[in-house]
Amino acid sequence: MYFRSNKQVRKEEVFMSGHSKFANIKHKKEKNDAAKGKIFTIIGREIAVAVKDGGPDPANNFKLAQVIAKAKASNMPNDTIERGIKKASGEGNSVNYEYCTYEGYGPSGTAIIVKCLTDNKNRTAANVRNAFTKGHGSIGTQGCVSYMFDEKGQIIIAKEDCEMDADDLMMIALDAGAEDFSEEDDSYEIITNPNDFEAVHAALEAEKIPMAEAEVTMIPQNYVELTAEEDLTNINRILDLLDDDDDVQEVYHNWDELIRFKVHKINGMDEKSVSFFINKSFFTLY
């Protein structure tokens, strides 16, 4: 349990900015206008499951409160959120969604975990298998790659949104049970044991500290660098196909995406441009 600071970053190192030992390389679904409909569909399913499991009151249902926060971060209208909760609470809600997880391998042994929420497991299994096959990967058995990841609570706080200084913020997090607190150029990262995530989250909320992201996630223990053009094409094909599937909730992998920003790729670019590419996950330079 310790505090790490990474304030000084040379130009040659900027492609690794934010890539701490706890850096999560979860493949996030795009949140542009074209993808909003899919994002809202996914969140709607999560609302339905959260309400079914813990009731419609977010004050007494932490899981639902988390989904609502995620919905608002994705600019989901409040009336859409409320309709989803009301629909999930009604007796006429006959759609039953189930969580399922698939594990497999991408190019050069990259590990991929796919978490889904579906009303038809046969359809979902076929679609996920197709994504791996088209990217020359393979589906494995349960547990074949999950041992390469650690399940952790992860909270990201943007510095521009937080008036509290780093030392005070660190003490609040650690006192509430956080395992680690780190500082990057523009954000703070808090890591927790999954069982302590809710307590740490509540402690930050009590201090009215805005959280840019807060979730229990899968963090790779090690990362795989892909440099061959064929490997890059194949892993992007797998991830793109999974992105297009509404049943897919989250995709975790240990491909070191940031390593693709070699020095010769970013020399001549100003820092703002490099940050834009990194922050927007724009990994199509090859």
Which residues are covered by each model-predicted region?
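Short, small-residue-biased leader/transition segments that mark boundaries at the very start
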Residues: M1-Y2
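N-terminal cationic and glycine-rich segments that engage phosphates or anionic surfaces
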Residues: E12-G140, V145-I156, D196, H253
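Positively charged N-terminal leader segments that act as targeting/secretion signals
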Residues: K262-F282
